[in-house]
Amino acid sequence: MTKILIIEDEEPIRRVLVRILIDENKNFQLTEADNGKEGMSFLKKEKFDLVLCDIKMPKMDGIEVLQKTKINNINIPFIMLTGHGNLETAVEAMKLGAYDFISKPPDLNRLLTAVRNALENKSLRTENNK
């Protein structure tokens, strides 16, 4: 079972992401967090295969979540989401190790392609490390 953490403060966007992912694959096990602090708490307790993370959130933003995962040696692909398609923020997220960067509301095909590619890339890296 593939475990995906969705960190998104806007509940309507979170619902859309959940629906898209469940429609794509019924075997996805989804966990939801409504801010970066809650998301970081999940990341410290559980293993996930992928994280979808908003950038602008209360309590802890997505960039800070990325920084903390790096500090804590949590090696999970992140797909960053933002309602403000800012190139500087995208570059910063990628420098911190984000796998991809998607504007909100997410385009269905773009999101699913990014999810599939991130999971496939993670699977290949895991195979190569055996």
Give the predicted meaning of each segment.
Residues 11-31, 45:
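Two-component/phosphorelay signaling modules centered on CheY-like receiver
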Residues 18, 32-41, 62:
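Helix N-cap/capping motif at the beta->alpha junctions
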Residues 22, 41, 63-75, 92:
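Short amphipathic alpha-helix used as the core "switch/output" element in two-component signaling
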Residues 46-52:
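Active-site beta3 strand of CheY-like receiver
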Residues 54, 82:
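Active-site residues of response regulator receiver
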Residues 57:
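Receiver (REC) domain active-site loop signature in two-component systems and cognate sites
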Residues 104:
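A Lys-centered signature of the CheY-like receiver
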